[in-house]
Design a protein with these regions (language model features):
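Transmembrane alpha-helical segments
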Residues: 32-37, 204, 348-353, 363-392, ...
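Transmembrane-helix motifs of polytopic, lipid-linked glycan transferases
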Residues: 109-132, 170-174
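Short periplasmic/luminal acceptor-recognition loop of GT-C membrane glycosyltransferases, typified by
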Residues: 404-441, 466-476
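Membrane-interface transmembrane helices that cradle and orient dolichyl/undecaprenyl
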Residues: 11, 130-136, 171-187, 197, ...
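Transmembrane-helix signature of polytopic, membrane-embedded enzymes
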Residues: 27, 108, 125-147, 166, ...
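Transmembrane-lumen/periplasm boundary regions of multi-pass, lipid-linked membrane glycan transferases
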Residues: 53-65, 196, 205-306, 316-328, ...
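Short helix- or helix-capping micro-motifs
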Residues: 31, 141-146, 194, 198, ...
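Short acidic/glycine- and proline-prone juxtamembrane loop motifs at membrane-interface regions
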Residues: 153-164
C-alpha cells in the first residue's frame, strides 16, 4: 500500500508557516556560522591523514593545468598525486575547479564547500523527517544533524565524506518521495544521487543500501521486485560505479589495493572490537543520544516507517562488520550515523512537542521554553567554538617548510605523521620510503602476515636514502630497536625540539652492519 502525502501537525513554535520558516532559517544561519569559524586554519584538526591526502590529489590536478608554475614544483605536485594511486576524482576535482576559478590554491576553500554541502543537506533531512513525523520532528532531526559537535567538526573536512553523507540524505529523501508518489521524476533523482554518492566514495554503498532496503521492506518484496521503476533506480545507481570499477581494476589496475587489508571477520568474536565500537559511538554522537535514538525507532507510528529506520541501522551494522578494524579505529567511518540518529530522534521530538501543545502554555511559558532551547544551543556552539580556538595549527606550516628546505634535493626515509602527507603537502618533500608505524605492523599481523626482519626491512627502506627523518619522537620511543640502531650507527645531521634527521651517508666509528 502506497501511503498518501502526510498532513502536517501543528508546531509548538506556532501555527504560522512564517514562524516555522523563521526558526529553520535561524538554525540554518547558526549551523553555517559555526562551521565558518577559524576555517582558514590548516586542516589538521580532524583526520589530518585523510584531509591532506585529498589536498595532495587536488593540488596535483591543479598543477597539471598551472603551466605558469615553476617546472620543478609542478612536476613534484603532479608526481605526488600520481604516486598516491587511484581514487574517485569527484571531490578533489571540485576543489581543483575552485582553485582555478579563484586563480590560486586556497586550502580552506574546499573545507568551506564541504560545510555548505553538509548544511544544505539538512534541508532534505528536514523534508524527509517532516514527512515521516511532523514539523517539530523535522526540526529536532535537523537540529541534531546540524549541531552535534562531531558533525560540526567533521562536516568541514577536506575529504569526500561530507559530500557522500549529503548525497545519501538526498537519496533517502528521494526514495521516500518515490514511495509516496511513485513517479519517474523521483526515479531519476534517486538513481543519480545514489550513483554519484557511491561514485564519490565506494563506502557510501552502505547508507545507500540502507535506503533501498527500507523502501523494499516497507513496500514488500514482491511489489518492489516486480516494479520496473525500482529496478531503474538500481541500474542508475550502479552505472557510475561500474564504470569507475572497470577503469580502476582493468585500465589503471590500481583499485585492487584500495580493498586490501580491510576485511577482518576474526574481530567479530573479539570483545575488544565491541568496546572500541562503543567508544566510537560515544565520541561521534554520545551514548545518551544513541540510546534515545534506538528507542525513537519504535515510536514511529506505522510499521512501514519503522522498517525504513530499522534498515538504516541494519546498513550501519553491516558496514561495521564488513570493515571491523577501521570501524573501531577511524571515527569518520561512523559519519553517516549523525543523520541516522537525527532521524531516529524525530519521534521523541514530536512526542515532547505534542505534550507541550497539550499543556497549552501561555506566551511567557512558551518564551521561557524557547529561551531554554536557545541557551542550550548557544552553550553547545560556544563549546565547539572553543575547540576550534584552543589549537592554532598555522605555525606548523613554517615547521614543515623548514624541514623541506633541509631535505630538498636529498632522498629521505621518514618516520612521520600521516603517512608522510604533512611532509609532502606542507614541506614539498616526497620521501623515498615511509617507515611503518607500530599500528601498521599490527594491522599486517592481524591479516596473518609475518612481521618483517628488522635489518632486512631497514636495508630495503633506506637503500636509496641519504637521510632518515623522524618527526614523531613518541613513535620512535615505541620502536626501541629502530631507535637504538639509528643512535649506534648514524650521526645526527640536524635536530630540533620535535624532529631528528640522521645522516645515512656516514656510519659511526665501530658501528656493526
Amino acid at each position: 500500500m502506497i501511503e498518501s502525502v502526510p498532513q502536517q501537525r501543528p508546531s509548538f513554535f506556532g501555527a504560522s508557516r512564517w514562524a516555522q520558516v523563521a526558526v529553520f532559517l535561524v538554525m540554518f544561519v547558526a549551523a553555517l556560522a559555526i562551521r565558518v569559524y577559524d576555517i582558514t586554519d590548516l586542516p589538521l584538526d580532524f583526520q589530518p591523514t585523510r584531509q591532506l591526502y585529498t589536498a595532495i590529489l587536488a593540488r596535483g590536478r591543479y598543477y597539471e593545468q598551472l603551466t605558469s608554475a615553476p617546472q620543478e614544483q609542478r612536476d613534484l605536485a603532479i608526481g605526488m598525486r600520481r604516486i598516491e594511486g587511484i581514487e574517485s576524482p569527484v571531490f578533489d576535482s571540485i576543489a581543483t575547479f575552485s582553485y582555478e576559478v579563484v586563480g590560486q590554491e586556497i586550502l580552506w576553500l574546499p573545507r568551506l564547500e564541504s560545510a555548505i554541502i553538509w548544511v544544505l543537506a539538512g534541508i532534505f533531512l528536514y523534508l524527509l523527517t517532516r514527512d515521516l513525523t511532523s514539523v517539530d520532528g523535522g526540526l529536532v532531526a535537523v537540529a541534531f544533524y546540524w549541531f552535534a559537535p562531531y558533525g560540526i567538526i567533521a562536516s568541514r573536512a577536506f575529504m569526500p565524506d561530507p559530500l557522500t553523507t549529503a548525497l545519501s540524505i538526498l537519496t533517502w529523501w528521494g526514495l521516500y518521495r518515490w514511495y509516496l508518489k511513485r513517479s519517474w521524476k523521483w526515479v531519476v533523482i534517486c538513481g543519480l544521487a545514489a550513483g554519484l554518492a557511491i561514485f564519490t566514495k565506494a563506502l557510501a554503498v552502505f547508507p545507500i543500501f540502507g535506503g533501498f532496503l527500507g523502501i523494499l521492506l516497507a513496500r514488500g518484496l514482491r511489489k518492489s521486485f516486480t516494479d520496473v521503476q525500482f529496478w531503474a533506480m538500481g541500474i542508475l545507481t550502479a552505472i557510475p560505479t561500474l564504470i569507475y570499477m572497470f577503469y580502476g581494476f582493468f585500465v589503471q589496475k590500481g583499485l585492487g589495493s584500495d580493498f586490501a587489508l580491510r576485511f577482518f571477520p576474526q574481530l567479530w568474536i573479539d570483545p575488544v572490537f565491541y568496546l572500541r565500537w562503543e567508544g566510537m559511538i560515544e565520541s561521534v554522537i554520545g551514548l545518551a543520544f544513541f540510546v534515545a535514538a534506538l528507542v525513537g525507532i519504535f515510536l514511529y507510528e506505522t510499521k512501514e516507517k519503522r522498517w525504513i529506520l530499522i534498515s538504516y541501522w541494519i546498513a550501519y551494522v553491516i558496514f561495521a562488520l564488513t570493515f571491523a578494524y577501521y570501524f573501531s579505529t577511524h571515527d569518520y567511518y561512523h559519519i553517516a550515523l549523525v543523520p541516522v540518529v537525527g532521524l531516529s530522534l524525530a519521534p521523541l521530538g514530536e512526542l515532547i512537542s505534542s505534550r507541550l501543545r497539550q499543556l497549552n502554555p501561555g506566551k511567557w511559558l512558551r518564551f521561557v521554553i524557547i529561551a531554554c532551547l536557545v541557551f542550550g544551543l548557544a552553550f553547545n556552539l560556544w563549546n565547539v567554538r572553543n575547540t576550534f580556538h584552543k589549537t592554532d595549527y598555522r605555525p606548523q606550516l613554517a615547521y614543515w617548510q623548514h624541514i623541506g628546505v633541509v631535505l630538498k634535493g636529498h632522498s629521505t626515509t621518514a618516520l612521520t605523521q600521516d603517512y608522510g602527507y604533512r611532509l609532502e603537502y606542507l614541506g614539498w618533500i616526497l620521501p623515498a620510503a615511509y617507515w611503518p608505524y607500530t599500528g601498521d605492523t599490527a594491522l599486517r599481523e592481524l591479516a596473518g602476515m609475518a612481521p618483517p626482519d628488522f635489518l632486512s626491512q631497514f636495508k630495503q627502506l633506506t637503500k636509496r636514502s641519504e637521510f632518515f627523518l623522524i618527526t614523531d619522537l613518541q613513535e620512535l620511543d615505541d620502536q626501541p630497536q629502530l631507535k637504538d640502531y639509528l643512535q649506534t650507527h648514524y650521526p645526527v645531521y640536524e635536530q630540533g625540539t620535535d624532529y631528528l634527521i640522521y645522516d645515512l651517508r656516514t656510519t659511526l666509528p665501530g658501528a656493526t652492519p
